[in-house]
Curated annotation (Swiss-Prot):
SUPFAM superfamilies: Cysteine proteinases. Belongs to the peptidase C1 family. Disulfide bonds join 132-175, 166-207, 259-302. It is found in: Secreted. This is Cathepsin L 1. The lineage of its organism: Eukaryota, Sar, Alveolata, Ciliophora, Intramacronucleata. GO terms for molecular function: cysteine-type endopeptidase activity.
Amino acid sequence: MMLLGASLYLNNTQEVSDEIDTANLYANWKMKYNRRYTNQRDEMYRYKVFTDNLNYIRAFYESPEEATFTLELNQFADMSQQEFAQTYLSLKVPRTAKLNAANSNFQYKGAEVDWTDNKKVKYPAVKNQGSCGSCWAFSAVGALEINTDIELNRKYELSEQDLVDCSGPYDNDGCNGGWMDSAFEYVADNGLAEAKDYPYTAKDGTCKTSVKRPYTHVQGFKDIDSCDELAQTIQERTVAVAVDANPWQFYRSGVLSKCTKNLNHGVVLVGVQADGAWKIRNSWGSSWGEAGHIRLAGGDTCGICAAPSFPILG
């Protein structure tokens, strides 16, 4: 293990010594992420979890199988996989949702598309949902902000908190999870506040009905039926997608290919490489992954083709 700049990073080309001073590594990690625990018992538990996660990453790099991605001890290093899932992977897929069947034969044959690096678009900074299961709101707002710029040449910084607090009648549940299509329905019916008027708090609150909601461009939404249609759609706009993000906890860089199709997290598809790898905008801050993004292997990796959708704007 080595320190790479300010980041605690396990390099897959480096043999990990059994003599690593885990205690010092843990102290450095706590300093970087400003971690303080309430009592000695909690401190001991978090140290054990940190050690377990260190061993997990160590085993990943010691595996003889060649990996296409890298892992690191990031801001989630003191969370067990169960705690991580309970806090961050709370997407609520409606029982009525029609999920697309997996297509293992899909192969992308187009050119690279990257909405994060397009001169026609002012790409918004990656946001952080914090310890609130509001990924669905960030997925919806991300698609709205970027697509409104692409399609209408209008720039907004919209309020995820408006969705968290106010879209309960649309079967969303704030920090306990929700669904992107339901968020689009709410915005179509009610408009959406700007972030400056309804700032994000990372917790459930009472709906502020008196706040102005000047964003009124959503006329509905369109569900995408296949990987082929998803590949066509990303040529013209970004897409809200549902994925399995269980293996994403310690992701640092590269193309991730191993995951299930158990949909538990909402994100935004913002590009596709010429080799078919998908580029995803996440909501765990810009220090996570590749400047807040992750790349997934082409096809229906992590269930990305199961339930994509985008807002219809006007």
